[in-house]
Amino acid sequence: MAAVFLVTLYEYSPLFYIAVVFTCFIVTTGLVLGWFGWDVPVILRNSEETQFSTRAFKKQMRQVKNPFGLEITNSSAASLATGMALRTDCLEDSRLTCYWGCSVQKLYEALQKHAYCFRISTPQALEEALYSDYLHREQYFIKKHSKEEIYCQLPSDTEIEDFGPVPRSRYPLVALLTLADEDDREIYDIISMVSVIHIPDKTYKLPCRILYQYLILAQGQFYDLKQLFMSANNSPPPSNDESPEDRSVEQSLLEKVGLAGNDGDPVEESSRDCVVCQNGGVNWVLLPCRHACLCDSCVRYFKQCPMCRQFVQESFALCGQKEPDKDLLETS
């Protein structure tokens, strides 16, 4: 019996040693990958580890004041045949110029010209860059802080029923907001705003909405204005201890980054609660998913967005007063 056992052990010992070596190799590889920031199974991670070794880059941001605001007030009823209603909210006297059937190619060529050739600070400058490649033009004078509705509609004599199948060579409507007073252009970094608007027609019935918004800077840059996403859970209304000045500053900041509601009402306190601890106020935006969902304390613990699980490449703070330790934002 002993001889049979020894023979069996001798036959299977190489397989046993191979299995042990292979297991050690897998565990060592997992630990090394985890040390250098690669995502590894939870079972291979240190149970006492409280923070990830890889930190998202902190994106350097510069605060600028956007003097322009534009929204669609009748998106459900708007169409190419009946027109649409726009509401502006500008900090200074401005001009709203609407270009119907603007060439897609010419528009982006015009934006590139702003960066390399000349500045798009007036409607005339944009029209020269477009080579007047649009079907109809309307212009309105906007008084500062006026929220009057402006109704835009193609004239009936144009006899345009649609802009063709997708992909299209023309945008239904391009709205340009510019500062009316030349002196105001020296005050603001943002000198104009281009909004590309889709309007449903007989061929393409997607609901009316703003497709893109580009902020045109005096220095020659232009940026695509993106919306941020926040949680909308129900919670008690905001406390009355907050001063009106603090509320106005907070609301102004949210409007600049696109978080304010379309109706201009203050954002509820629920939308400012951290989705993890439900305690601190939301102050960090994660990129590229654009979820604003973490407070100053919780941002250091995540390399994946807690809302959509997408890996975080960069992040930035909405307010600069409170920041985590610098070493927590460094990438190994």
Swiss-Prot record:
Its main location: nucleus. It is found in: Nucleus; Endoplasmic reticulum. PANTHER family: CELL GROWTH REGULATOR WITH RING FINGER DOMAIN PROTEIN 1. A zinc finger (RING-type) spans 274-309. This is Cell growth regulator with RING finger domain protein 1. Able to inhibit growth in several cell lines. It comes from the Eukaryota. One of its GO terms (molecular function) is zinc ion binding. InterPro entries: CGRF1 (IPR042496), Znf_RING (IPR001841), Znf_RING/FYVE/PHD (IPR013083). Keywords: Cell cycle, Endoplasmic reticulum, Growth arrest, Metal-binding, Nucleus, Zinc, Zinc-finger. It comes from Mus musculus (Mouse). GO terms for biological process: regulation of cell cycle. The keyword Zinc-finger applies. GO terms for cellular component: endoplasmic reticulum; nucleoplasm.
